[in-house]
């Protein structure tokens, strides 16, 4: 047996349906669309969610709240992640984005107190939790809250 004798398994290569090519093709005449009606017309069919005039599910269910366009998502970062920086380094929002710890598109960053930090760092940031601040200062570092 060589490469020229290889064939795909029976039934694995299905022919595509060529509609409107005469009755001999098996898909002629009405082109698999049935007789008349909205779905038989060109561009026919109904939009997503349309239920034939019945009140659609999306309108029957109650709505609650909304997502404010003014508020931006706050990206959180735990103290344990700051161990990746060297001792004595000054960390600000720009450096966090530069290092890849936070996406560059992040508008607000808050440092939280999960985990431990084992060396002193200087952190300049707008938002930081009390626990995170205490842990950084306990490790010999300092926190400068920027306004």
Curated annotation (Swiss-Prot):
Biased composition annotated in UniProt, kind: Gly residues: 21-31
InterPro entries per the UniProt record, alphabetical: Ribosomal_uL15, Ribosomal_uL15/eL18, Ribosomal_uL15/eL18_sf, Ribosomal_uL15_bac-type, Ribosomal_uL15_CS
GO biological process: translation
GO CC annotations on file: large ribosomal subunit
Region of interest (Disordered), residue spans: 1-63
Family classification: Belongs to the universal ribosomal protein uL15 family.
Physiological role: Binds to the 23S rRNA.
Cross-referenced PANTHER family: 50S RIBOSOMAL PROTEIN L15, LARGE RIBOSOMAL SUBUNIT PROTEIN UL15M
Protein name, as recorded: Large ribosomal subunit protein uL15
Source organism (scientific name): Syntrophus aciditrophicus (strain SB)
Phylogenetic classification of the source organism: Bacteria, Pseudomonadati, Thermodesulfobacteriota, Syntrophia, Syntrophales
Gene: rplO
């Amino acid at each position: 047996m060589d490469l020229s004798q290889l064939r795909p398994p029976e039934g694995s290569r299905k022919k595509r349906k060529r509609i409107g090519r005469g009755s001999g093709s098996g898909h002629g005449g009405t082109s698999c669309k049935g007789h008349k009606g909205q779905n038989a017309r060109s561009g026919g069919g109904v939009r997503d969610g349309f239920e034939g005039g019945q009140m659609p599910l999306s309108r029957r269910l109650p709505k609650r709240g909304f997502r404010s366009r003014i508020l931006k998502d706050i990206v959180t970062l735990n103290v344990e992640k700051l161990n990746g920086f060297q001792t004595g380094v000054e960390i600000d929002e720009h450096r966090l984005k530069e290092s890849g710890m936070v996406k560059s598109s992040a508008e607000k960053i808050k440092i939280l107190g999960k985990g431990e930090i084992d060396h002193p760092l200087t952190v300049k940031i707008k938002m930081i939790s009390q626990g995170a601040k205490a842990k950084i200062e306990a490790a010999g570092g300092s926190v400068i809250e920027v306004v």
